[in-house]
Amino acid sequence: MKNYSAEDLQKNYDKFIEALSKVFSGERLEKLKFMYSQEELGTELVLAPASGKEHYHSAYVGGYLDHVMNVARNAYKMKKIYEEGGIKVDFTDEELFFAAFHHDLGKLGTKGNPHYVEEESDWHKKNQGAMFKINGENHYMDVTHRALWLLNQYGITYSEKEMIGIMLADGLYNEGTKPYFISFRPEMRLKTDLPYILHWADHMSCRQENKQWEDSKPF
């Protein structure tokens, strides 16, 4: 697991805001920067892990930002593979990056109430690898539902494709999204490839991050 210093965390935050500024513009960018400001969700953004257990992916302080940046990079690479294969891409780069950057936004929780809090039980840390636990102070929500709720709270609009990309990033790992991927009627199939690319990029990123953890173990 990575052990970031305060300086490292600040650099990661600055890189993320810089990435937003390269992709988005106008009112949308300003609202995103406000949502991620220190007065709003900035603290949660910087400190959040990407998961709660060390054998999942990026379960350390700052892991969330590492993960979403990995997903964004892998999603863009996956899009290029699509194009090289002669498949027509039916979404914009902005839609791709918006969905990638925000597919796990719900893991930030709400302002002042993070989604993950440190696990205090040494037994759970030792025997289950549980470094963080879900914060019971927040209303229970699916991570993607909270992501969309947060975007709505800050007045950040999104396209239908961006919404579907965020909703379906977990692919078949989420029982609630299976009907979107498994359809026996042509007219009910997904009408954009964005969710496929987002899911593959998310899955790849999780595996890469998990492999880094496996390789870092002393035995």
Where are these regions (language model features)?
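Divalent metal-dependent catalytic cores for phosphoryl transfer on phosphate-bearing substrates
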Residues: 52-61, 66, 78, 89-213
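Conserved hydrophobic/aromatic pocket- or pore-lining residues that grip, position, or stack substrates
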Residues: 71
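Non-catalytic interface/linker regions that flank or bridge core catalytic/transmembrane domains
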Residues: 1-49
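Structural motif corresponding to the C-terminal cap of alpha-helices
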Residues: 75-83
